[in-house]
Protein backbone atom coordinates (compact mmCIF):
# COMPACT_ATOMS: atom_id res chain seq x y z
CA UNK A 1 0.00 0.00 0.00
CA UNK A 2 1.38 3.38 -1.05
CA UNK A 3 -0.01 6.18 1.08
CA UNK A 4 1.10 9.57 2.34
CA UNK A 5 -0.80 11.79 4.72
CA UNK A 6 -0.55 14.25 7.59
CA UNK A 7 -1.11 12.53 10.92
CA UNK A 8 -1.66 14.21 14.28
CA UNK A 9 0.86 13.08 16.87
CA UNK A 10 -0.50 13.46 20.41
CA UNK A 11 1.51 14.85 23.27
CA UNK A 12 3.37 12.30 25.40
CA UNK A 13 4.48 9.96 22.61
CA UNK A 14 7.74 9.97 20.70
CA UNK A 15 7.38 10.13 16.93
CA UNK A 16 8.65 6.54 16.71
CA UNK A 17 6.12 5.27 19.24
CA UNK A 18 3.32 7.07 17.39
CA UNK A 19 4.46 5.56 14.09
CA UNK A 20 4.22 2.10 15.66
CA UNK A 21 0.53 2.72 16.44
CA UNK A 22 -0.07 3.71 12.81
CA UNK A 23 1.69 0.59 11.52
CA UNK A 24 -0.73 -1.52 13.56
CA UNK A 25 -3.72 0.58 12.54
CA UNK A 26 -2.99 0.25 8.81
CA UNK A 27 -1.45 -3.25 9.11
CA UNK A 28 1.64 -2.19 7.21
CA UNK A 29 5.18 -2.51 8.55
CA UNK A 30 6.84 -0.48 5.80
CA UNK A 31 6.27 3.02 7.12
CA UNK A 32 8.20 6.16 7.93
CA UNK A 33 7.80 9.77 8.97
CA UNK A 34 9.50 13.09 8.39
CA UNK A 35 9.98 16.06 10.70
CA UNK A 36 10.42 14.54 14.16
CA UNK A 37 8.32 15.93 17.01
CA UNK A 38 9.65 15.25 20.49
CA UNK A 39 7.26 13.80 23.11
CA UNK A 40 6.27 17.21 24.54
CA UNK A 41 5.06 18.53 21.17
CA UNK A 42 1.90 17.54 19.34
CA UNK A 43 0.62 18.15 15.84
CA UNK A 44 1.26 17.49 12.18
CA UNK A 45 3.61 14.62 11.33
CA UNK A 46 4.12 13.59 7.71
CA UNK A 47 3.69 9.81 7.44
CA UNK A 48 4.19 7.54 4.44
CA UNK A 49 3.67 3.86 3.69
CA UNK A 50 5.10 1.56 1.03
CA UNK A 51 7.18 3.03 -1.78
CA UNK A 52 6.25 6.53 -0.62
CA UNK A 53 8.69 6.21 2.30
CA UNK A 54 11.42 6.90 -0.27
CA UNK A 55 9.93 10.29 -1.18
CA UNK A 56 10.61 12.33 1.97
CA UNK A 57 13.71 14.03 0.56
CA UNK A 58 11.68 15.30 -2.41
CA UNK A 59 8.82 16.79 -0.38
CA UNK A 60 8.36 20.50 0.20
CA UNK A 61 8.27 20.60 3.99
CA UNK A 62 8.85 24.27 4.69
CA UNK A 63 7.90 26.66 6.08
CA UNK A 64 6.56 25.14 9.30
CA UNK A 65 3.90 26.80 11.44
CA UNK A 66 3.41 26.26 15.17
CA UNK A 67 1.11 27.44 17.92
CA UNK A 68 2.97 27.86 21.19
CA UNK A 69 2.14 29.02 24.69
CA UNK A 70 4.96 30.81 26.53
CA UNK A 71 4.75 30.64 30.32
CA UNK A 72 6.47 33.80 31.51
CA UNK A 73 8.51 33.81 34.71
CA UNK A 74 9.22 30.07 34.75
CA UNK A 75 12.63 28.40 34.63
CA UNK A 76 12.71 24.85 33.24
CA UNK A 77 15.76 22.79 32.33
CA UNK A 78 13.89 21.41 29.31
CA UNK A 79 12.21 24.70 28.31
CA UNK A 80 8.78 23.08 28.63
CA UNK A 81 6.42 22.32 31.52
CA UNK A 82 8.61 19.44 32.70
CA UNK A 83 11.77 19.79 34.81
CA UNK A 84 10.58 23.10 36.27
CA UNK A 85 13.03 24.53 38.81
CA UNK A 86 11.55 27.95 39.56
CA UNK A 87 8.29 29.85 39.16
CA UNK A 88 8.29 33.60 39.76
CA UNK A 89 5.35 35.96 39.90
CA UNK A 90 6.43 38.71 37.53
CA UNK A 91 4.70 41.91 36.58
CA UNK A 92 2.43 41.94 33.58
CA UNK A 93 3.90 43.34 30.38
CA UNK A 94 2.32 45.88 28.09
CA UNK A 95 1.16 44.24 24.87
CA UNK A 96 2.97 46.83 22.68
CA UNK A 97 6.27 45.92 24.39
CA UNK A 98 5.72 42.24 23.67
CA UNK A 99 4.82 43.04 20.08
CA UNK A 100 8.00 45.10 19.71
CA UNK A 101 10.13 42.10 20.65
CA UNK A 102 8.11 39.87 18.30
CA UNK A 103 8.87 42.32 15.50
CA UNK A 104 12.58 42.42 16.39
CA UNK A 105 12.85 38.64 16.23
CA UNK A 106 12.06 38.29 12.52
CA UNK A 107 14.47 36.96 9.91
CA UNK A 108 17.65 34.99 10.66
CA UNK A 109 18.24 34.17 14.33
CA UNK A 110 21.31 32.46 15.79
CA UNK A 111 20.71 30.02 18.63
CA UNK A 112 21.94 26.87 20.35
CA UNK A 113 19.48 23.94 20.21
CA UNK A 114 18.08 22.96 23.62
CA UNK A 115 19.35 19.86 25.43
CA UNK A 116 15.79 18.52 25.37
CA UNK A 117 15.39 18.44 21.59
CA UNK A 118 14.93 15.81 18.90
CA UNK A 119 18.36 16.58 17.45
CA UNK A 120 20.50 13.46 17.08
CA UNK A 121 23.85 13.09 18.86
CA UNK A 122 25.76 10.09 17.49
CA UNK A 123 22.45 8.47 16.56
CA UNK A 124 20.67 9.20 19.86
CA UNK A 125 18.05 11.90 20.39
CA UNK A 126 19.35 14.73 22.56
CA UNK A 127 16.28 14.58 24.83
CA UNK A 128 16.98 10.91 25.59
CA UNK A 129 20.50 11.82 26.75
CA UNK A 130 19.21 14.82 28.71
CA UNK A 131 16.72 12.63 30.59
CA UNK A 132 19.67 10.52 31.77
CA UNK A 133 21.52 13.62 32.94
CA UNK A 134 24.10 13.40 30.17
CA UNK A 135 25.21 16.83 29.00
CA UNK A 136 25.97 17.25 25.32
CA UNK A 137 27.53 20.11 23.42
CA UNK A 138 25.18 21.18 20.66
CA UNK A 139 26.58 23.39 17.94
CA UNK A 140 25.11 26.85 17.35
CA UNK A 141 22.58 26.98 14.50
CA UNK A 142 20.47 29.47 12.63
CA UNK A 143 16.76 29.54 12.00
CA UNK A 144 14.64 31.91 10.00
CA UNK A 145 11.46 33.37 11.43
CA UNK A 146 9.15 34.24 8.54
CA UNK A 147 6.24 35.46 10.63
CA UNK A 148 5.09 35.57 14.24
CA UNK A 149 1.92 36.99 15.72
CA UNK A 150 0.41 37.21 19.18
CA UNK A 151 -2.85 35.27 19.43
CA UNK A 152 -3.64 36.20 23.02
CA UNK A 153 -2.00 37.31 26.25
CA UNK A 154 -3.47 36.23 29.57
CA UNK A 155 -0.61 36.86 31.99
CA UNK A 156 1.59 34.91 32.54
CA UNK A 157 0.64 32.98 29.39
CA UNK A 158 1.45 34.35 25.94
CA UNK A 159 0.00 32.50 22.96
CA UNK A 160 1.74 32.93 19.62
CA UNK A 161 1.60 31.53 16.10
CA UNK A 162 5.01 31.34 14.47
CA UNK A 163 6.18 30.31 11.00
CA UNK A 164 9.79 29.19 10.71
CA UNK A 165 12.34 27.42 8.53
CA UNK A 166 13.18 23.72 8.69
CA UNK A 167 15.35 22.83 11.66
CA UNK A 168 14.03 25.62 13.87
CA UNK A 169 13.44 25.03 17.58
CA UNK A 170 10.55 26.90 19.16
CA UNK A 171 11.97 26.20 22.62
CA UNK A 172 15.05 28.20 21.63
CA UNK A 173 12.87 31.01 20.26
CA UNK A 174 11.07 31.09 23.61
CA UNK A 175 14.39 31.26 25.47
CA UNK A 176 15.67 34.13 23.31
CA UNK A 177 12.35 35.98 23.59
CA UNK A 178 12.45 35.74 27.39
CA UNK A 179 16.05 36.92 27.47
CA UNK A 180 15.02 40.11 25.68
CA UNK A 181 12.38 40.66 28.37
CA UNK A 182 14.97 40.07 31.09
CA UNK A 183 13.11 37.06 32.52
CA UNK A 184 12.88 33.29 32.30
CA UNK A 185 10.14 31.63 30.29
CA UNK A 186 9.24 28.16 29.16
CA UNK A 187 6.71 26.52 26.86
CA UNK A 188 3.55 25.10 28.38
CA UNK A 189 2.29 23.80 25.03
CA UNK A 190 3.55 23.38 21.48
CA UNK A 191 1.59 22.30 18.43
CA UNK A 192 2.73 22.08 14.83
CA UNK A 193 -0.24 23.03 12.67
CA UNK A 194 1.42 23.07 9.26
CA UNK A 195 4.49 21.59 7.58
CA UNK A 196 4.91 23.00 4.09
CA UNK A 197 1.51 22.38 2.51
CA UNK A 198 0.76 19.49 4.87
CA UNK A 199 -2.08 20.09 7.32
CA UNK A 200 -4.00 17.54 9.37
CA UNK A 201 -7.16 16.27 7.69
CA UNK A 202 -8.14 13.01 9.40
CA UNK A 203 -5.24 11.08 7.81
CA UNK A 204 -6.71 11.60 4.35
CA UNK A 205 -4.55 10.04 1.63
CA UNK A 206 -2.87 12.73 -0.47
CA UNK A 207 -1.80 12.99 -4.10
CA UNK A 208 1.94 12.98 -3.53
CA UNK A 209 2.70 14.71 -6.84
CA UNK A 210 1.08 17.86 -5.45
CA UNK A 211 3.50 17.85 -2.53
CA UNK A 212 6.87 16.98 -4.03
CA UNK A 213 9.24 19.85 -4.66
CA UNK A 214 10.04 18.87 -8.26
CA UNK A 215 9.15 20.08 -11.71
CA UNK A 216 7.43 17.72 -14.15
CA UNK A 217 9.20 16.50 -17.26
CA UNK A 218 7.81 14.68 -20.28
CA UNK A 219 8.80 11.87 -22.63
CA UNK A 220 6.91 10.62 -25.67
CA UNK A 221 7.73 6.94 -25.20
CA UNK A 222 6.18 6.19 -21.81
CA UNK A 223 6.97 2.50 -22.27
CA UNK A 224 10.55 3.35 -21.37
CA UNK A 225 9.39 4.27 -17.88
CA UNK A 226 7.25 1.15 -17.61
CA UNK A 227 10.25 -1.00 -18.53
CA UNK A 228 12.91 1.00 -16.72
CA UNK A 229 14.78 1.46 -20.00
CA UNK A 230 17.62 3.94 -20.39
CA UNK A 231 16.48 7.48 -21.17
CA UNK A 232 18.46 9.98 -23.21
CA UNK A 233 18.29 13.74 -22.63
CA UNK A 234 17.16 14.34 -26.21
CA UNK A 235 13.99 12.33 -25.54
CA UNK A 236 12.88 14.69 -22.76
CA UNK A 237 11.06 17.99 -23.12
CA UNK A 238 13.31 19.76 -20.57
CA UNK A 239 17.09 19.30 -20.66
CA UNK A 240 18.29 21.54 -17.79
CA UNK A 241 20.15 19.78 -14.99
CA UNK A 242 18.18 18.89 -11.87
CA UNK A 243 15.59 16.46 -10.55
CA UNK A 244 12.21 15.93 -12.22
CA UNK A 245 9.23 13.63 -12.06
CA UNK A 246 7.61 11.98 -15.07
CA UNK A 247 4.21 10.35 -14.74
CA UNK A 248 2.21 7.78 -16.61
CA UNK A 249 -1.40 6.83 -15.97
CA UNK A 250 -0.56 4.45 -13.11
CA UNK A 251 3.02 5.24 -12.14
CA UNK A 252 5.58 8.00 -11.84
CA UNK A 253 9.36 8.08 -11.86
CA UNK A 254 11.88 10.55 -10.50
CA UNK A 255 14.92 11.27 -12.62
CA UNK A 256 18.05 13.37 -12.43
CA UNK A 257 19.70 15.16 -15.33
CA UNK A 258 23.40 15.91 -14.96
CA UNK A 259 26.03 16.48 -17.65
CA UNK A 260 23.54 15.43 -20.36
CA UNK A 261 22.99 12.09 -18.64
CA UNK A 262 19.67 10.87 -17.27
CA UNK A 263 19.61 8.76 -14.13
CA UNK A 264 16.66 7.13 -12.40
CA UNK A 265 16.39 8.13 -8.74
CA UNK A 266 13.13 6.23 -8.31
CA UNK A 267 11.33 4.29 -10.98
CA UNK A 268 7.80 3.00 -11.42
CA UNK A 269 6.34 4.27 -8.17
CA UNK A 270 2.68 3.29 -8.12
CA UNK A 271 0.18 6.10 -7.64
CA UNK A 272 -2.21 5.65 -4.73
From Swiss-Prot:
Similarity comment: Belongs to the pseudouridine synthase TruB family. Type 1 subfamily.
Statement: the UniProt record of this protein carries the keyword Isomerase: yes
UniProt keywords, alphabetically: Isomerase, tRNA processing
Protein name: tRNA pseudouridine synthase B
Biological role stated in the UniProt entry: Responsible for synthesis of pseudouridine from uracil-55 in the psi GC loop of transfer RNAs.
PANTHER family named in the record: PSEUDOURIDYLATE SYNTHASE TRUB1, TRNA-PSEUDOURIDINE SYNTHASE
Domain of life: Bacteria
HAMAP family found in the cross-reference section: TruB_bact (MF_01080)
InterPro entries: PsdUridine_synth_cat_dom_sf, PsdUridine_synth_N, tRNA_psdUridine_synth_TruB
Reactions it catalyzes: uridine(55) in tRNA = pseudouridine(55) in tRNA
Entry's Gene Ontology BP terms: mRNA pseudouridine synthesis; tRNA pseudouridine synthesis
EC numbers, comma separated: 5.4.99.25
Active site, per annotation: 38
GO molecular function list: RNA binding; tRNA pseudouridine(55) synthase activity
Amino acid sequence: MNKIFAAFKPRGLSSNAFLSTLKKKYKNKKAGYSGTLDPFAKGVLIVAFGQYTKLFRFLKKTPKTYKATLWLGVYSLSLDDQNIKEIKNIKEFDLPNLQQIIDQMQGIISYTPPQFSAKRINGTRAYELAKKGIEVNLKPCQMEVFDCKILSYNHPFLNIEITVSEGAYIRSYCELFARKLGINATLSSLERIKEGKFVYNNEKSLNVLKYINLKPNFIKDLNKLENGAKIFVEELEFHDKGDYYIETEKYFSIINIKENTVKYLLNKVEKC
